[in-house]
Amino acid sequence: MRLLERMRKDWFMVGIVLAIAGAKLEPSIGVNGGPLKPEITVSYIAVATIFFNSGLSLKTEELTSALVHLKLHLFIQIFTLAFFPATIWLFLQLLSITPINEWLLKGLQTVGCMPPPVSSAVILTKAVGGNEAAAIFNSAFGSFLGIVITPLLLLLFLGSSSSVPFTSIFSQLFMTVVVPLIIGQIVRRYIKDWLERKKPPFGAISSSVLLMIIYTTFCDTFSNPNIDLDKFSLVLILFIIFSIQLSFMLLTFIFSTRNNSGFTPADTVAIIFCSTHKSLTLGIPMLKIVFAGHEHLSLISVPLLIYHPAQILLGSVLVPTIKSWMVSRQKGVKLTRPTV
């Protein structure tokens, strides 16, 4: 019974495993030209659905209300979309001499290029009791920035790997990402009261569509006899991903708790999660567009598929530790505050 409850709670993780297993058993269903016609249903309809859904769910009023914390927002966005990918690129120059599968290493670079997620960083920040408004702003604003910056970063670091012309990539991004997102925001203005009252399961809808994208991506992998993923590379990538997450969480903690940083303990909590978390919901569709038709797309996607559950797992484990630190710091501030 407890196992069923756990599976119900983590249904998306179970879904990823089942999607990959299903693709392994019968890859012909989800390949290009197959019964599912992913070149249409996934490349256009599924991706557009995810971003229309994002447009409906993103609360623009919360973006404007949190604008005053400019220093905090700059820190998070620069760390996420500049420092993170640049550091990963330098790290990969060292890893390139190892026997790790080169396409998994390229996949690590794509992780670095991704924007923050819309949900997980906010959920964990709230669980600790950190600056939730800042987390909401940076998750939403980072998603908007990511629509433009992430494809540019992917082309900057991995441009030679993509067989799709630059103009083709951005025209498809515009039609399947920007337009649905804007339409979603416009529709939201007219049905905002209904959305607040009914609270549709936006996360579950996007996650379900995402499972279809993951399934078809791995159908391409398993239908290609030239692709072989060795277990040694996979285990090393798993270790590297957890190491990267821990290192960057520690780094953001050190930077944001310096005496002259100007950040409160609650700000630090938002910084730790928002700066180090990466979006799977936005990332996989973007990889599908930027690397459309690429025979190694699924291998490139593997690190991001690992990073997503890893960041939730690691964040959840660290919630009690970070919370006790934040509470003790806040008590310390109150004790040192002069009484009148």
UniProtKB/Swiss-Prot annotation:
Naturally occurring in which organism (per UniProt): Homo sapiens (Human)
Keyword Cell membrane: yes
Job description of the protein: Involved in teeth and skeletal development. Has an essential role in the biosynthesis and trafficking of glycosaminoglycans and glycoproteins, to produce a proper functioning extracellular matrix. Required for extracellular matrix mineralization. Also involved in the regulation of cellular calcium homeostasis. Does not show transport activity towards bile acids or steroid sulfates (including taurocholate, cholate, chenodeoxycholate, estrone-3-sulfate, dehydroepiandrosterone sulfate (DHEAS) and pregnenolone sulfate).
Extracellular side of membrane: 32-37, 93-116, 160-163, 223-234, 292-298
Gene3D superfamilies: 1.20.1530.20
Keyword ATP-binding: no
Tissue: Widely expressed. Expressed at high levels in liver and at lower levels in prostate, placenta, kidney, heart, lung, thymus and spleen. Strongly expressed in testis and also detected in brain, ovary, colon and small intestine. Weakly expressed in testis and not detected in brain, ovary, colon or small intestine. Isoform 1: Expressed in liver, testis and placenta. Isoform 4: Expressed in liver, testis and placenta.
Protein name per Swiss-Prot or TrEMBL: Sodium/bile acid cotransporter 7
Disease linked to the protein: Short stature, amelogenesis imperfecta, and skeletal dysplasia with scoliosis: An autosomal recessive disorder characterized by disproportionate short stature, defective tooth enamel formation, and skeletal dysplasia with severe scoliosis in some patients. Variable features include facial dysmorphism, hearing impairment, and mildly impaired intellectual development.
